[in-house]
């Protein structure tokens, strides 16, 4: 007797079993389901799947895309907005909000967790806005925007979308950004966590909210005055070009000494000239030299998901009445030298970091155990790296040997790729130092 299949009416099920069934669907399929109707969009939203990141890239030409990242599952929804694909390459049709994409295509690589959508519409700005709005509705998370000067030249109403008016990170790229463009952005967008401004900006437009984000990078801070410097409530700051002089920096340090509520942890000032003596330039400050009993010699900070270190053995120390310690340190460089103001929220950061490593690495060892159950093609070195009892220096040495062999032998499998990802992340977390 031949088995006859029939449609299964998921939408007619009660909410709880309906959500449980939909959780078995891949994220790309859930997105397609949510586009069927407002009711289905609400149904997908009711599953309460929270993404890790909603990332918009708004560059030049065909460099407009949205990524929704699910880091724990190592899956990504990627939607790019094309300007030049021919109709035959995008035979599908999708409606997202107020936009009808007559040219669209879905391409899934489930084995690596990639669900890609490509689309064309003559109104690129509204297309991005509507797709982003829908994705944010069904997969709520923090939003980061990478925005180029070239895209801004035709910027109209992208930031009229409410969900894009309060974001976590804004990165501006390009050469020069004039006042009218800056007003279009900063009059509507509020940045909570990080602002990175690479273009040279109009000195007549002070970006005042830059003073109050957590992390700030200004390639051109020439619009800033001493008063702006004293108003900073950021944690981490990087000024590449500026007009600050020694008197400004002295007043800045004095303000920190008198402000126990300061959140500052790290400020970098690009410095075009050599500095022979810090103490000679900070004569009015009460300072002292490095004491190894007070702190470690290197200051640790994270940038671009990597750990960095600044040698502060020749630094100039300032100690506040409440015991908080800060260091002025000059770091010469052939391209761009740096003058740092560093606050030691943790005086022995490397020691504390090493103490935390076993707990940080534990989830990765659990993932490796699961991978051994799914894939039985591990080599001896991979088995060794999967051993949680392996000492850190032994892990580092074994990892380097394995990666050295990878450069000579290119044998590929899904299991190997997934294990390498984990080993790479573990190695970066350990971040072994030679000194």
Curated annotation (Swiss-Prot):
Domain F-box: 7-58
Record-linked PROSITE patterns: FBOX (PS50181)
InterPro entries, A to Z: F-box-assoc_dom_typ2 (IPR012885), F-box_dom (IPR001810)
Bridged cysteine pairs (disulfide): none
Entries under Pfam families matching the protein: F-box, FBA_2
Name of the protein this chain belongs to: Uncharacterized protein F59B2.8
Organism per entry: Caenorhabditis elegans
